[in-house]
Amino acid sequence: ITSLFLNPGSVIEYIIYFAVSFLISIFSGLFSYGETYIYLKTSCGQQPVLSDLFYGFKQTPDRIIRVAVVFSLISYLLNLPVFLLSLLPQETLLNGYGMLLFSLLTVVCAVIGMLLMLTYSQSYYLLLDFPDCSAREALRKSRDMMKGSKGRLFYIDLTFVPLMLLCVLTCGIGLLWLMPYMQATKANFYLDLVKQN
């Protein structure tokens, strides 16, 4: 850490890197929203068109950006402690306590991040279903909808792990079929949640 702070250039480089990647993740949220729209339409028996991918740019992008900011903040804030710990000298990290602390912190941050992402996972669907809903309302409704259903969605995610491993054997080509299948499954999960609530 001391070498990082003794070299102001590296601090600025890290800040620029995180700022740019944060902005990219927010911008990609608009495309994720369009992708969600495509799979929700498909699950409802409607025919999607290519322009649906850009639906987030047309339909009140400020709400979508606010939700994307929340998702990005969850990701970046939970990765920050692990990142800062990884800046420690290798001698400190490789001793017994350093490695244990690093591993423990990584697991804790991953679990918290996963729980938060599962909690707010239905936000884009809610923004699509309720055009007058604000970003804050969508996040709150998602939290309420996912009470008691996080385990079910986590189980669905786990069922895709073996298929992802098979996709590794195809050098990622299998993902061309797996990713749409996963997204359609999640859209159907949302429709099932709506029926239950």
Specify the residue positions occupied by each region the protein language model found.
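Hydrophobic alpha-helical membrane segments
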Residues: 1-197
